[in-house]
């Protein structure tokens, strides 16, 4: 058990949104729960009762009422709220308990001055852009694609598109042409909205050539709308219109197309590290219910909050963030390089304090980021709680990778002792976290607090049995409304079934190793398909990184295990990226081995340690352990990884060269 770092206040039930929900359950459903575990058990055993309570508690507006809550619980293909019609955008724009003049979007950027939208201004912009899309012929089922960053216009476009019953999809503008076309050629968008470029730190990035290449590769695009972001005075290329024209004056009312509960809302994509990215279709109703539940009951967000999560439009956390107004929360957007201080007219300087200053300047109450960012701040010995005013901050979220115990202790030592740290894990596949935090439970170092309401998460042994207190495969044994409607262009559902249900029929296999404790806390130790198996003992990759990357000399690392075809122990290989100017020598190798042996076990000591310039990562910063392993076992680079999905595809060359040298081929 990790160190106890935070305990809920004694009046948590009186002051939290989940406390209010519990009182509502008592009054409206005659249900009384002594603690979170009882509530969770009910939420995953009476699925229809729980999800109908979410619908009713949050007063979901339906044009046609559902004939049932869950008419078919079979996975895949569970049928939620049949007969219901509603619209996601309408619920986001309800912005409960917010006045017209209240700020609802606060956006900071390294490309332009800050922008704030009030609730009235947001509705007005959505009204105009909705009318503009209709003028372009966009209607129900059409796809609208955004090659745009985390700025208010992208959020407005999402709401305008989905208000029409059209389907939204975004790629961040740092995505290269191949990465974008691999995604959008699958869904064939009718309209493309694209920025001319952006600024990353003090570096201008012109994307006009990429936009031309993307348009050329997408014959389905009938209209291209240019958003002059890098250069506000830039003339639009021939054959395109402008954002100002799209958002022009109109008498058209702001209306919302009623669509079925499972009508496609947006298409997100798997990382696409091997083959084409999987186009994951999410539905209006499932995303709405899941985000209402998570944002209000787990993150405790409401009209008094300012909610920030560092994300680009190419990561599902952006979609999660921008649902914030549905629970009344103001959202804080940031576009730029989080690791530099960039001021107009001055060269950018390395500085991990930028996001903390943003939180202070905007009065952020809930700060979301990634585990690698928190660990980088710890390594740089930042103490943001002492250097900027974070007095408004009461919640901090971490995701993207497991957060080790030392990351937890750094937050409580250097950021604030009174905030609740919520480490959460989920995926693009469900556009949420299915394990995370909740105001009712304490925080222990290195441990995800609980399984989320409505998420029947289990750890399964190699024999397929549910286990407690030991490592197992993370599975979900009951449907969730935000599971995908399906994959795009997968009419028989084969690709969808193969992705999640091929190992355990009728049970969602997520691909992570998880340990669930007796009290319900969770520890995720890495991807199950990247497992290290030493003498029959499974080792998670995350624990390696938590030790190796705390060393001052090590900037990044990746570990893989190469099995012995004849049944031997195989080889455990560790690759490290060192700080500038350092070379790996036997002294540092010995120190790394010693740290792993002492902190973990002798089994964790690599057979070989090698230096590389960079660890391959996806565009959402995830390490590519499986493709590295494939390359090291002889798979050609082009077959092992879709290079368009990588932030640094050139990093694969070193592993290919290493494989040749190692095998002599």
Each predicted region: which residue ranges?
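Conserved C-terminal "lid"/linker of ANL adenylate-forming enzymes
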Residues: 223, 558-564, 573-574, 593-665
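Conserved AMP-binding/adenylation subdomain of ANL enzymes
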Residues: 288-306, 314-365, 380-382
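Adenylate-forming
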Residues: 149, 191-210, 231, 335-338, ...
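AMP-binding/adenylate-forming catalytic core of the ANL superfamily
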Residues: 146, 171-197, 211, 360, ...
């Amino acid at each position: 058990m990790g160190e106890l770092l935070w305990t809920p206040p004694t009046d948590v039930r009186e002051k939290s949104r989940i406390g209010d929900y519990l009182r509502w359950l008592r009054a409206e459903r005659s249900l009384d729960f002594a603690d979170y575990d009882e509530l969770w058990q009910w939420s995953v055993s009476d699925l229809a009762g729980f999800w109908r309570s979410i619908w009713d508690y949050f007063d979901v507006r339906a044009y046609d009422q559902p004939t049932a809550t869950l008419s078919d619980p079979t996975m895949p293909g569970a049928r939620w709220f049949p007969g219901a019609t509603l619209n996601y955008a309408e619920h986001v724009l309800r912005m409960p308990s917010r006045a017209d003049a209240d700020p609802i979007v606060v956006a900071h950027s390294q490309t332009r001055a800050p922008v704030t939208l009030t609730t009235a201004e947001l509705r007005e912009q959505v009204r105009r852009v909705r009318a503009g899309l209709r003028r372009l012929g966009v209607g129900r089922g059409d796809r609208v694609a955004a090659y745009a960053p985390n700025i208010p216009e992208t959020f407005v476009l999402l709401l305008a598109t989905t208000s029409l019953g059209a389907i939204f999809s975004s790629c961040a503008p740092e995505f290269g042409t191949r990465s974008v076309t691999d995604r959008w050629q699958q869904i064939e968008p009718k309209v493309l909205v694209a920025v001319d470029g952006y600024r990353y730190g003090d570096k201008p990035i012109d994307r006009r050539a990429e936009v031309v290449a993307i348009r050329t590769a997408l014959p389905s695009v009938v209209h291209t709308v240019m958003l002059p972001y890098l250069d506000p005075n830039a003339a639009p290329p021939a054959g395109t219109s402008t954002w100002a024209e799209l958002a022009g004056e109109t008498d058209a009312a702001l209306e919302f197309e009623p669509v079925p509960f499972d009508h496609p809302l947006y298409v997100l994509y798997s990382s696409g590290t091997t083959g084409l990215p999987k186009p994951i279709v999410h539905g209006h109703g499932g995303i709405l219910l899941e985000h209402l539940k998570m944002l209000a009951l787990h993150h405790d967000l409401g009209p008094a909050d300012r909610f920030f999560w560092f994300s680009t439009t190419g990561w599902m956390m952006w979609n999660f963030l921008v649902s914030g107004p549905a629970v009344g929360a103001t959202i804080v957007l940031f576009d730029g390089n989080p690791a530099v201080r960039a001021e107009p007219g001055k060269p950018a300087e390395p500085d991990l304090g930028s996001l903390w200053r943003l939180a202070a300047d905007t009065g952020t109450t809930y700060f979301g980021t990634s585990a690698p960012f928190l660990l980088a701040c710890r390594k740089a010995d930042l103490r943001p709680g002492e250097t900027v005013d974070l007095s408004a901050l009461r919640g901090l979220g971490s995701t993207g990778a497991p957060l080790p115990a030392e990351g937890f202790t750094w937050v409580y030592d250097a950021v604030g002792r009174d905030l609740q740290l919520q480490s959460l894990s989920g995926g693009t596949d469900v556009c949420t976290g299915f394990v995370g935090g909740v105001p009712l439970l304490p925080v222990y170092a290195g441990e995800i607090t609980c399984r989320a309401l409505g998420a029947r998460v289990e750890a399964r042994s190699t024999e397929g049995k549910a286990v407690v207190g030991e490592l197992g495969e993370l599975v979900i044994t009951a449907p969730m409304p935000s599971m995908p409607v399906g994959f795009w262009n997968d009419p028989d559902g084969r690709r969808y079934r193969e992705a999640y249900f091929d190992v355990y029929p009728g049970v969602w296999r997520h691909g992570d190793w998880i340990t669930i404790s007796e009290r319900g806390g969770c520890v995720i130790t890495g991807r199950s398909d990247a497992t290290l198996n030493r003498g029959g003992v499974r080792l998670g990759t995350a624990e390696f990184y938590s030790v190796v990357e705390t060393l001052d000399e090590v900037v990044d690392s990746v570990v893989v295990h190469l099995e012995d075809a004849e049944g031997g122990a195989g080889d455990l290989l560790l690759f490290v990226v060192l700080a500038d100017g350092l070379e790996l020598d036997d002294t540092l190798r010995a120190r790394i081995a010693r740290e792993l042996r002492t902190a973990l076990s002798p089994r964790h000591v690599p057979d070989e340690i090698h230096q590389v310039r960079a660890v391959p990562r996806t565009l959402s910063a995830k390490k590519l352990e499986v493709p590295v392993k494939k390359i090291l076992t002889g798979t050609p680079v082009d077959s092992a990884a879709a290079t368009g999905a990588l932030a640094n595809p050139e990093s694969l060359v070193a592993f290919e060269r290493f494989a040749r040298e190692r095998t002599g081929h």
